[in-house]
C-alpha cells in the first residue's frame, strides 16, 4: 500500500466513516499555480473569465457543512512552487488563523479557510530532483514518515498466505538491502525500498516471470540510480537479489 492509500485511510479514520464526498485529492507539479489552486483568469470564448480553483471550491463546500470534517489531500506536494501556489494562504492555513478572512489576489471577496478543513500533503523524499519544503510552509504541518511495512503484522500474514519460498527469500534480501541503504551517508532511510513493489499478489499470480521482472526491471535499475558512482556495490547487490529467485 502506497502513501496515497494511507492518506485516504487516515482521512476516513479521522472522519469515522468512509465518505468520499468529503475527501478531495490533487497532485502538484511544476506547472501547477495559484490560479489552479485558488482562482485566476482563464481564456474563454469572450476573452478571459475568473475561474475558481480546486482548494477554493473545496473550502466553500466545507464551509456550508461545518459540522463535518473535510480532507484535502495533496500528492507530491514538494513538486510545486509552494510559495506561488499558496500565496496568501500561507497564513490562512494556520490553526489560529482559521476562519479569519483575507482579501484574495484576483477578487474583492474575503476568503477564509474553514476550521473543519484538514490538509494532508504527501511527498517523496527519495526524489533528488525535488526541493524540500519551504520552511515557512513546513512549520505549518506536522510530519510523519511512512516506512517500509515489511515487519508489519499485515505484511507477515500476506507472506504466509502467498507461501512462496523465492518470494520470502527476496523480501529478506530487500530488508538487508534496506539496512545498507539506511546507513549510507548519501542515501539514508528516506531511500529505503518500500513494500508497494510486492503488494496485491495472489498465490496463482506470483511466479518466476513476475519475480524476474521486479528484480531486473524495478529493483536493479533503482540501485543503479542510487549508487551510480559505486558500480561494484550495484553488482554485488544485484547478484544477491538475483540469487534469491533462482
Predicted regions and their residues:
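AAA+ P-loop NTPase catalytic core and its hallmark functional loops
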Residues: 1-187, 202-217, 221, 225-246
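Helical subdomain adjoining the active site within ATP-dependent kinase catalytic cores
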Residues: 197-199
Amino acid at each position: 500500500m502506497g502513501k496515497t492509500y494511507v492518506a485516504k485511510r487516515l482521512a476516513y479514520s479521522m472522519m469515522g466513516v468512509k465518505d468520499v464526498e468529503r475527501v478531495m485529492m490533487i497532485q502538484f507539479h511544476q506547472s501547477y499555480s495559484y490560479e489552479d489552486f485558488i482562482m485566476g483568469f482563464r481564456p474563454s470564448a469572450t476573452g478571459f473569465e475568473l475561474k475558481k480553483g480546486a482548494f477554493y471550491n473545496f473550502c466553500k463546500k466545507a464551509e456550508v457543512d461545518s459540522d463535518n470534517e473535510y480532507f484535502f489531500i495533496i500528492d507530491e506536494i514538494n513538486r510545486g512552487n509552494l510559495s506561488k501556489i499558496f500565496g496568501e494562504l500561507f497564513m490562512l492555513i494556520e490553526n489560529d488563523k482559521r476562519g479569519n478572512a483575507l482579501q484574495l489576489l484576483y477578487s474583492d471577496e474575503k476568503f477564509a479557510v474553514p476550521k473543519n478543513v484538514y490538509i494532508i500533503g504527501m511527498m517523496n523524499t527519495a526524489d533528488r530532483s525535488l526541493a524540500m519544503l519551504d520552511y515557512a510552509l513546513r512549520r505549518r504541518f506536522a510530519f510523519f514518515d511512512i516506512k517500509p511495512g515489511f515487519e508489519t503484522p499485515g505484511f507477515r500474514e500476506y507472506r504466509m498466505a502467498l507461501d512462496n519460498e523465492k518470494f520470502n527469500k527476496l523480501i529478506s534480501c530487500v530488508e538487508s538491502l534496506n539496512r545498507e541503504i539506511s546507513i549510507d551517508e548519501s542515501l539514508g532511510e528516506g531511500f529505503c525500498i518500500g513494500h508497494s513493489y510486492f503488494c496485491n499478489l495472489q498465490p496463482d499470480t506470483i511466479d518466476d516471470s513476475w519475480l524476474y521482472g521486479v528484480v531486473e526491471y524495478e529493483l536493479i535499475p533503482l540501485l543503479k540510480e542510487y549508487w551510480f558512482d559505486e558500480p561494484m556495490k550495484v553488482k554485488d547487490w544485484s547478484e544477491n537479489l538475483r540469487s534469491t529467485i533462482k
